[in-house]
Amino acid sequence: MKPVIALVGRPNVGKSTLFNRLTRSRDALVADLPGLTRDRHYGEGRVGERPYLVVDTGGFEPVAKDGILHEMARQTRQAVEEADVVVFIVDGRNGLAPQDKSIADYLRKTGRPIFLVVNKAEGMKYTAVATDFYELGLGDPRAISAAHGDGVTDMINEALEVAYAGQPEEADEDDPSRGIKIAIVGRPNVGKSTLVNALIGEDRVIAFDMPGTTRDSIYVDFERNGKKYTLIDTAGLRRRGKVFEAIEKFSVVKTLQSISDANVVILLLDAQQDISDQDAHIAGFVVEQGRALVIGVNKWDGLDDHARDRAKADLTRKLKFLDFAKSHFISAAKKTGIGALMRSVDDAYAAAMAKLPTPKLTRALIEAVEFQQPRRRGPVRPKLRYAHQGGQNPPIIVIHGNALDAVTETYKRYLENRFRETFSLTGTPLRIEFRSSNNPYADKG
């Protein structure tokens, strides 16, 4: 699994700025999705061929006793305990603060690898910036400027060396013969463990722990209607006899890693609760990771018609950026709607892995342009000439032509919808890339 780097520090030291810099290559993929909040706290970064997950823990108040600060501190502690590396950020301009000492005292006790990073160090001599912070007893401070990028690459490379060194070797969880890997994600108490047991059946459980990580990820192999699947633990599911029960302590780290490791994600919602920002954040990460997605709205049997209409409206309004995914209204406890849910899992996986021939893609592109041309930008109208597939899981369609920087986001979404309809790409994100070039086949008979 991808290593996790947790960003920790008191408020206003630049954690979000560093987060944005570390994940910048991914921001564009989700920033323009209608309805998706930009206030994200986790994302993916990449240095060369090494991907990693980043968690921005928010302002850390380790001594908070109640209220929202206490909850933030609890979530931060959990993220720290599950991270591979902790980047502890302090403010070089304001110097050492009492709160920094409290955080350092806590971090030293965790046993996690700690990188002490002095932010806002631009234009300052290292000795002037770093001297105060040696007092924290966390080794040599690393001076950076998250805003300008100074020192960030060296720092993250060092952190990744440590993070990857602690990663276990990938075992047979990557064996393609094991079938579609499914992650069931959602907030506590939405019914994840109930759905797992409904899917697997108590007498057909084949479960084992994959050792080697401090998080003891669990992979559960099962068959349904003759097809093989593997469930990835996301909820702290632990086997008790023949039944899985949830240790209902929501873990951002486990959720992110499970999404990243899955072929298809089932986002499970509680029909009796409003969709939260946390639900939207998780959904946004699924899209960012390019994972196929199916939405399950659980506990549907407990709602009357008015409440059902309200729940559907809430889903449409708050998760409209997931309009490519099928939604199923289910009862995991009564095992209703499970069959249709799993058929959508199969369909979403097939769509994510679809092979799209260049002639058919180009024909679909030409038909889309003939039906609705892209708008001019000033005197220039984009010319879309041909298309080919650039990747799978998720499908990437590369469109070649001229003046493609003038293509609007609205027209890009129009093309996406046309391709989805033509090639039945339901349940998977779809990436469209534009490249200005000549058609190499134009002069060939």
Swiss-Prot record:
Gene3D superfamilies from the UniProt entry: 3.30.300.20, P-loop containing nucleotide triphosphate hydrolases
UniProt entry keywords in alphabetical sequence: GTP-binding, Nucleotide-binding, Repeat, Ribosome biogenesis
GO biological process: ribosome biogenesis
Residues that, per the record, bind GTP 1: 9-16, 56-60, 119-122
Pfam families: KH_dom-like (PF14714), MMR_HSR1 (PF01926)
Keyword Glycosyltransferase attributed: no
Alphabetized CDD domains for the sequence: EngA1, EngA2
Keyword Nucleotide-binding: yes
InterPro entries membership: AAA+_ATPase, G_ENGA, GTP-bd, GTPase_Der, KH_dom-like, KH_dom-like_a/b, P-loop_NTPase, Small_GTP-bd
One Gene Ontology molecular-function label: ribosome binding
Domain KH-like: 354-438
Positions contributing to GTP 2 binding: 186-193, 233-237, 298-301
Domain EngA-type G: 3-167, 180-353
Family from the record: Belongs to the TRAFAC class TrmE-Era-EngA-EngB-Septin-like GTPase superfamily. EngA (Der) GTPase family.
Assembly notes: Associates with the 50S ribosomal subunit.
Entry-linked NCBIfam families: GTPase_EngA, small_GTP
Entry function: GTPase that plays an essential role in the late steps of ribosome biogenesis.
The name this protein goes by in its record: GTPase Der
Biological source species: Burkholderia cenocepacia (strain HI2424)
Taxonomy of the source species: Bacteria, Pseudomonadati, Pseudomonadota, Betaproteobacteria, Burkholderiales
